[in-house]
Amino acid sequence: MTIALGRFTKEENDLFDIMDDWLRRDRFVFVGWSGLLLFPCAYFALGGWFTGTTFVTSWYTHGLASSYLEGCNFLTAAVSTPANSLAHSLLLLWGPEAQGDFTRWCQLGGLWTFVALHGAFGLIGFMLRQFELARSVQLRPYNAIAFSAPIAVFVSVFLIYPLGQSGWFFAPSFGVAAIFRFILFFQGFHNWTLNPFHMMGVAGVLGAALLCAIHGATVENTLFEDGDGANTFRAFNPTQAEETYSMVTANRFWSQIFGVAFSNKRWLHFFMLFVPVTGLWMSAIGVVGLALNLRAYDFVSQEIRAAEDPEFETFYTKNILLNEGIRAWMAAQDQPHENLIFPEEVLPRGNAL
């Protein structure tokens, strides 16, 4: 019996092959298939943000000035969220709210959903770009895996949290002072700093900063003196094959300092990857919990005792009172559409009053 081995031949001008060849060609700025998602989305997200912070008011959604045109600066300008009455509408330009009127669309907060959605897909496109390039040059995909952490935080804070609340209104607006307001809101209404997922996130981010500082200093400290240049950067050839620092010396140093030390580079660098990525993912999970109004730690026994005994107070009970103050002062200012009015006697006062 005769068996013929072979493969099907494609047409020379196959459209997919032509596109693949052009997109993945070696050029100064790599495009790739991921670029079809990344570049348009990043362009629209950044363009929408610059347009909103320059020209668009938040008077109709928050009762605020939020653009350079109205007198804001870089720290106070923002692309603000839509009004609470619009709930979770995508606010498409051609939708029933704006009906194709660009000015009305901006006034309603359409730029926020535009920036948020294009920003999310732009970040995903950037992660796919790292996957694609890693595959092209036969690297492992850990860069892309690491970048999933900030994507998780962005999606949880800007998309999932407001989806769990009554509308996009409760998401952060895109601006520096606006993010600060959102942080205060998270503390006052969710007691976020006492949430264990926030604690893990802080440990991850600050732990990663500590690891970076220690790692950079250790490598600098153990560089081989194999050149006669005046400083670190002149003393080495960037294309040299051998390593430029002594892992053995570093291991001896930290073994004497702490009693333990990393014995190989793979475990050391994986740990530097693991700490911040895990911390950010834990924060993202915590924010998803807040979207469902899950509570942080409650030390009820301390609250009861503080209520019964005026002389008993802890940092926890003080923070609970501060949160009540944030809610009382912030709700009326932050949600003008609710027409909230708090009697003077329920507003928090300083001890001197």
Swiss-Prot record:
Localization, UniProt: Plastid, Chloroplast thylakoid membrane
Gene Ontology MF term list: chlorophyll binding; electron transporter, transferring electrons within the cyclic electron transport pathway of photosynthesis activity; iron ion binding; oxygen evolving activity
Cellular component, GO, one term: chloroplast thylakoid membrane
Broad class of enzyme this protein falls into: oxidoreductase
Keyword set includes Zinc: no
Membrane topology label: Multi-pass membrane protein
Keywords: Acetylation, Chlorophyll, Chloroplast, Chromophore, Electron transport, Iron, Magnesium, Membrane, Metal-binding, Oxidoreductase, Phosphoprotein, Photosynthesis, Photosystem II, Plastid, Thylakoid, Transmembrane, Transmembrane helix, Transport
UniProt function note: Photosystem II (PSII) is a light-driven water:plastoquinone oxidoreductase that uses light energy to abstract electrons from H(2)O, generating O(2) and a proton gradient subsequently used for ATP formation. It consists of a core antenna complex that captures photons, and an electron transfer chain that converts photonic excitation into a charge separation. The D1/D2 (PsbA/PsbD) reaction center heterodimer binds P680, the primary electron donor of PSII as well as several subsequent electron acceptors. D2 is needed for assembly of a stable PSII complex.
Family assignment from sequence similarity: Belongs to the reaction center PufL/M/PsbA/D family.
Protein name per UniProt: Photosystem II D2 protein
Gene: psbD
